[in-house]
C-alpha cells in the first residue's frame, strides 16, 4: 500500500505550498543519490519527488485529498471514459494545455522559478500609550525576520563546495512530460521536482541556513510614530520584511498600532473628552477653573483655563477649541477638547451655610418645611443626614 504523501514529506494536510516546498527541499537534499549513498536512499528520493509533484500542484493535490492515489491514476475519471486526461489535471488544464501548445510549438508553458523572488511581508503589533498616539514619537522594536545568510551569502551552499547543475532538468528548472490526448501527443512543462525550479542543486548545504540561503535573525528597529495615529493605524516600513531569494528585493514590515486607554481622557477621532468637577456655587454663579489637557499632561504647557458660565447645568459640555488630537498627516490642524461639567452637591454643610441657604430659599419663596423645589430638596437631603440632625438637636 502506497504511503501517504503528506506523511512522506512530514507535513500536515493543511500545510501551505511554501511549507510543503521547504519540507521537500530539505528531504531532497538529504536523500539525493549524489549525497546519500545508503541503501534505499534512491528509492526514498523518488518517493519524495513523487509526493512533491502531487502536493505542489493545486489540481493534483485537490484530487489526491479527495480520492487518494486512485484520483491520480485516472480511477476518479474512469466512469467518464477519460482515463488519459488524469495526467494533465482535468478539462480546464486540458484545453489550456491544448491552446498553449498550439500557439507555442507543442510545449505547455510553466513559469520557471529561477528568477529573483521578493521576500515576504511581515506584521508587527505595537502597543502605544494614549499620549504617544496623540503626539507621536519614536519607538524601538525588536523583530525576527529572514536575512541573507552571512555564511553562504545566499547561495545555500556550504563554503568551499559547489552548486551543480540539476541532474534532473539539466539546469532548465523545468521538466517535460509527454501526454497522450484525443488531440494527439503533447508535452507538458512543469517545475523540476528536484531543484524546485532553481536549475541548480547543492553539493553540500550550508550548515548555517540548511541550504535555504536565508537565515533567521533578530534585530532592532526604530519606528517613527506620526502624531494623530489611532488603534488600527497601519505603518509600512519599506524593505524591513524578509529578505528576497536569488537576489530578489526584501518584503516590507507592516506595523499595526493599538492604543491603550487613559484614565483621564477619552478619544473619538480628533476629539478629546473629559470631565471637570465644579461646586454647585460655581455652577450657579459662574467661575474660571484650570483643567488638564492632553498638552498639559504631556508636559507641553500649563493647564488650560476654562470659563464656567453662570447658571451652568449638570452635564453641560464646554469646548476648548484646538486642544484635541492633531490630524494625521497635518498635525497643525487639531480637533477640540470637549469637557462635561459634573456639579458636586455637598453631603455636609455647616450651620452657617445651612442658614444662608435657608434665607436664599425664603427669598425664592421655597417652603422649607415641605422641602419643595431644588434648594428645598437640597436642604431636605442635607437636614436628613445624621450629622446635620445632630446639629439641629444641639
Curated annotation (Swiss-Prot):
Recorded name of the encoding gene: dnaJ
Residue numbers binding Zn(2+) 1: 149, 152, 206, 209
InterPro entries: DnaJ, DnaJ_C, DnaJ_domain, DnaJ_domain_CS, HSP40/DnaJ_pept-bd, HSP_DnaJ_Cys-rich_dom, HSP_DnaJ_Cys-rich_dom_sf, J_dom_sf
Record-listed Zn(2+) 2 binding positions: 166, 169, 192, 195
Zinc finger (CR-type): 136-218
PROSITE patterns, sorted: DNAJ_1, DNAJ_2, ZF_CR
Name of protein: Chaperone protein DnaJ
Family statement drawn from the similarity comment of this UniProt entry: Belongs to the DnaJ family.
Function in brief: Participates actively in the response to hyperosmotic and heat shock by preventing the aggregation of stress-denatured proteins and by disaggregating proteins, also in an autonomous, DnaK-independent fashion. Unfolded proteins bind initially to DnaJ; upon interaction with the DnaJ-bound protein, DnaK hydrolyzes its bound ATP, resulting in the formation of a stable complex. GrpE releases ADP from DnaK; ATP binding to DnaK triggers the release of the substrate protein, thus completing the reaction cycle.
SMART domains assigned: DnaJ (SM00271)
A GO cellular-component term linked to this record: cytoplasm
Entry cofactors: Zn(2+)
Amino acid at each position: 500500500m502506497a504511503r501517504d504523501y503528506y506523511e512522506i514529506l512530514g507535513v500536515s494536510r493543511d500545510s501551505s505550498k511554501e511549507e510543503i516546498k521547504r519540507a521537500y527541499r530539505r528531504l531532497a537534499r538529504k536523500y539525493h543519490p549524489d549525497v546519500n549513498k545508503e541503501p534505499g536512499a534512491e528509492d526514498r528520493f523518488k518517493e519524495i519527488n513523487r509526493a512533491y509533484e502531487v502536493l505542489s500542484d493545486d489540481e493534483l493535490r485537490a484530487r489526491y485529498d479527495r480520492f487518494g492515489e486512485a484520483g491520480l491514476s485516472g480511477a476518479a475519471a474512469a466512469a467518464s471514459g477519460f482515463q488519459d486526461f488524469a495526467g494533465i489535471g482535468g478539462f480546464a488544464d486540458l484545453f489550456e494545455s491544448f491552446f498553449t501548445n498550439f500557439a507555442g510549438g507543442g510545449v505547455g508553458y510553466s513559469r520557471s522559478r529561477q528568477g529573483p523572488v521578493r521576500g515576504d511581508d511581515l506584521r508587527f503589533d505595537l502597543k502605544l500609550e494614549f499620549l504617544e498616539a496623540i503626539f507621536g514619537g519614536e519607538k524601538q522594536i525588536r523583530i525576527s525576520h529572514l536575512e541573507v545568510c552571512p555564511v553562504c551569502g545566499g547561495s545555500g551552499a556550504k563554503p568551499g563546495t559547489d552548486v551543480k547543475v540539476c541532474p534532473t532538468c539539466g539546469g532548465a528548472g523545468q521538466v517535460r512530460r509527454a501526454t497522450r490526448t484525443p488531440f494527439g501527443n503533447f508535452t507538458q512543462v512543469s517545475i523540476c521536482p528536484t531543484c524546485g525550479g532553481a536549475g541548480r542543486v547543492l553539493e553540500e548545504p550550508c550548515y548555517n541556513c540548511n541550504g535555504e540561503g536565508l537565515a533567521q535573525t533578530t534585530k532592532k528597529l526604530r519606528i517613527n510614530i506620526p502624531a494623530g495615529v489611532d488603534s488600527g493605524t497601519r505603518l509600512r516600513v519599506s524593505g524591513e520584511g524578509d529578505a528576497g531569494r536569488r537576489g530578489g528585493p526584501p518584503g516590507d514590515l507592516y506595523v499595526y498600532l493599538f492604543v491603550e486607554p487613559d484614565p483621564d481622557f477619552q478619544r473619538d477621532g480628533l476629539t478629546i473628552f473629559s470631565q471637570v468637577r465644579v461646586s454647585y456655587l460655581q455652577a450657579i454663579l459662574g467661575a474660571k477653573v484650570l483643567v488638564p489637557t492632553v498638552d498639559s499632561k504631556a508636559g507641553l504647557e500649563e493647564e488650560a483655563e476654562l470659563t464656567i458660565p453662570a447658571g451652568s447645568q449638570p452635564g453641560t459640555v464646554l469646548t476648548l477649541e484646538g486642544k484635541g488630537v492633531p490630524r494625521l498627516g497635518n498635525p497643525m490642524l487639531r480637533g477640540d477638547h470637549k469637557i462635561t461639567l459634573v456639579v458636586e452637591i455637598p453631603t455636609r454643610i455647616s450651620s452657617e451655610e445651612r442658614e444662608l441657604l435657608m434665607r436664599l430659599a425664603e427669598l425664592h419663596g421655597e417652603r422649607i418645611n415641605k422641602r419643595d423645589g431644588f434648594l428645598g430638596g437640597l436642604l431636605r437631603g442635607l437636614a436628613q443626614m445624621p450629622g446635620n440632625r445632630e446639629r439641629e438637636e444641639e
